[in-house]
Design a protein with these regions (language model features):
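A short structural micro-motif
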Residues: 66, 105-106, 306
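A short, well-structured juxtamembrane/interface segment
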Residues: 105-112, 174-175
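Short alpha-helical linear motifs
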Residues: 82-86, 107-110, 368-374
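Catalytic micro-motifs at enzyme active sites that drive phosphoryl/nucleotidyl and oxygen chemistry
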Residues: 72, 111-112, 139-142, 178
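Major-groove recognition helix of helix-turn-helix-like DNA-binding domains
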Residues: 73-93
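Single, function-defining residue in the core of a domain
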Residues: 1-58, 91, 99-102, 117-121, ...
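DNA-recognition alpha helix
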Residues: 55-73
Length: 387
């Protein structure tokens, strides 16, 4: 007879319920609620994420199939499709947003991995657009016949988890999200070409942080000093000021412009940074690691349920995205705390077919020989946590 709790119930133990309850109280999330609380809602959504449910109906069918186990799964009472839909439509998404922020902080504390041996953190900031059907998601109008939202993410490269998430309509330009970033003195911030906003970059400079942005090809710098002996692959390395009035007004300080050539295909990359002393090799290494935020977007869109939404209102969509991020951070925490040597992709595949099994988590990952999982795993897919 199996004495171990269900796998999903063991995962729930990694969540800080007291913190969640305090957030719920702050927003009066359970006011006038008799049975199906915000906690029950969170666990239902996470069960759907981990079990790869494609729709609200699909999730409810799965819950009904395990109706006799829900109490021992820690989910509580069963819920109807209409009640879950109502909860996602009406309950304040900020409850889940704030708890996602808490889970991000918890995951980051555990997953410090000094790749660059710097005093400050190293972040990549980028966005991904999630397309929505305009006829269903009328509030998310993007173009004439298209809807969508943007997920702006500040990604902690060394901890390999998001540090900050900001959701906007898809028609908001990437650089408009830059003022929302919680900047830290001494940190490095890496951007792609969509973030050539020199006023915001000057904000980073003023607080004593560093930026590295891939510049547009027409950027003009008046050189004051330049390096004559350049390492292989570095075409140019100069320090100067902007020559264009608008740019110089937004960023009046000196900055550095590097042109680095990719030895494999000859592509030239133009970078701007306020780090005037770092080696060109270090700058190049920083930008190469920016790709990890792209892998995060690819991973979360492929393996967590944010492509197919279980509600049509903006509130419901936000709740689902934040529950996806909470789930992502939970798996990252479990992987760290249990010292698992599997990638998060493998962990999710195993969990997806084992949530209602009764075995200890450590035994599940130690004893399982999921060759079919590895066979299905495409090595070209992002594998963020496979150390």
């Amino acid at each position: 007879m199996h004495k171990d709790p269900y796998i999903f119930a063991q995962l729930v133990k990694f969540l800080d319920r007291s913190k969640f309850n305090r957030i719920v109280t702050k927003y009066e999330g359970d006011k006038y609620i008799k049975s199906y609380t915000c906690w029950n809602q969170l666990l239902t959504m996470m069960f759907g994420q981990l079990s790869n449910r494609d729709s609200l109906r699909d999730l409810i069918v799965a819950m009904e199939a395990h109706a006799g186990k829900l109490y021992h799964l820690e989910i509580g009472k069963s819920v109807t499709r209409s009640n879950l839909s109502k909860a996602n439509e009406q309950r304040n998404y900020r409850i889940f947003e704030e708890y996602a922020t808490f889970m991000i902080a918890e995951a980051r504390k555990r997953r410090i991995n000094k790749i660059f041996e710097l005093d400050g953190h190293v972040y990549a900031f980028d966005s991904t657009t999630i397309d929505l059907c305009l006829s269903v998601f009328e509030w998310a109008k993007f173009r004439k016949h298209k809807g969508g939202i943007k997920l702006h993410t500040l990604y902690d490269i060394e901890a390999e988890v998001p540090a900050f998430v900001h959701i906007t309509p898809a028609n908001i330009h990437d650089s408009k999200a830059m003022p929302e970033i919680p900047y830290e003195s001494g940190a490095h911030y890496i951007f792609d070409r969509g973030y050539n906003d020199f006023s915001n970059l000057n904000t980073i400079n003023r607080i004593g942080a560093f930026f590295l942005v891939r510049a547009k090809t027409n950027v003009r710098i008046k050189p004051k000093t330049w390096k004559r002996r350049l390492p292989e692959g570095v075409v140019s390395d100069v320090i100067g000021c902007f020559t264009v009035y608008k740019s110089s007004k937004d960023y009046p300080e000196e900055l550095r412009k590097l042109i680095i050539e990719n030895p494999e295909d000859g592509t030239r990359y133009i970078f701007l940074t306020n780090n005037l002393d770092a080696s060109a090799e270090f700058i190049s290494s920083l930008y190469r690691n920016r790709w990890s935020v792209e892998l995060f977007f690819k991973w979360i869109k492929q393996h967590l349920r944010i492509k197919k939404f279980w509600g049509t209102s903006e509130n419901a969509v936000r709740i689902q995205i934040y529950c996806a991020i909470i789930t992502y951070c939970l798996v990252a925490i479990v992987q760290h705390d249990m010292k698992l040597e599997r990638s998060v992709y493998e962990i999710l595949q195993i969990l997806g077919i084992s949530l209602t099994d009764k075995t200890h988590l450590s035994d599940l990952f130690d004893k399982s020989n999921f060759k079919n999982v590895k066979d299905r795993y495409d090595s070209s897919e992002p594998n963020l946590f496979n150390f």
